[in-house]
Amino acid sequence: SVVGSAAAWITQALPFSPEQGTVVFWLVNLGFVVVLWAVVAVLTVRMAGRRWTDGLMVAVAPGIVLAGTINWDLWAVALLACGMYAWSRGRSLTAGVLFGLGAAMKLYPLLILGPLLILAVRSRRWRPFLLAAGGTVAAWAAVNVPLMVVNVQAWSVFFTFSGERGPGLSSVWHAWDVTAAQAGWAFVPEGSLTLLAYGTFAVCCLGIFVLGVRVRHTPRLAQLTFLVVAAFVLTNKVYSPQFVVWLIPLLALALPRWRDFWVWQTVEALHFFAVWMYLAKGVAETPPQHSMDDSVYVAAILAHMLAVLWLCGRVVWEMLHPAEDLVKRDHGGHPDTDPLAGAYAGPARGRSGQPAAVQA
């Protein structure tokens, strides 16, 4: 990656021996992670508005402590947070550019275009959405097209691998295969996995779209974005341990309830250790009685999935019952309030063009 190459260049420029290079490379990336973590925390505090303490969830999240250094995902998380902050200030094009840069790091920031489309449909104001979408595409292309031109084969490795890979760690599909191996059931057919995973995600997105458009009062951007990203991580071919980092800032803005946060983070921490114990079983030469049973690993996956589904259910409940939405309550109490709405602040508009905040 570009970031990895930059970290390698910095490592080589420092006065350390080749033997020390691996540790120095990790420390350089750790420095980036700490800065990015702080950026995301500060922006989340800013976006939380009157409920600024909700943003502290990002600062204390065990999920970031445990998984923040596994990959370069925090770059995408930070760019998405920057984009959402720009959007909340009415800078639609700038937000789109930041979303696109985030998507160049990790594709998941693209998912926010779905929630923005829902808000565009509800408000019947298309220009902000088109500006954001255009900025996203342009920024993503500005990063990727030169790399594609230089070496399209290397550039396409990620997409080829993603399309051809089988069930990955901690996905529902992998949990099924691990269970099937013990019970003698049929495995998930690899030739159909892509269709199953992305088809399930598409169905979830359709459900979120219908809910977002038809719900009586305008849902908040953070609520919709959390639902879409959660649907992706639950249905994807793999649930890498660092994917929890994607959800933490979104939850702080979508469902700022500390009890739910700590229960979820506890479950995710248990799942984190279960993943590494499962991997250790495959590479370490230890007796079976000293290894974690596969059923415990599957139970950890199911617990993680149920915890995320519980959070999704809570978000949907507050979308349907805005009087229980703490963010709306503390930002004036109007059922259509959203401090992150940006260009879509205010009630939705009906077919006549008049405000229709209670339109079904």
Regions found by a protein language model. Give the residues of each.
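Multi-pass membrane glycosyltransferase architecture that uses lipid-linked
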Residues: 1-155, 197-360
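Generic multipass alpha-helical transmembrane bundles of integral membrane proteins
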Residues: 165, 169-195, 204-205, 221, ...
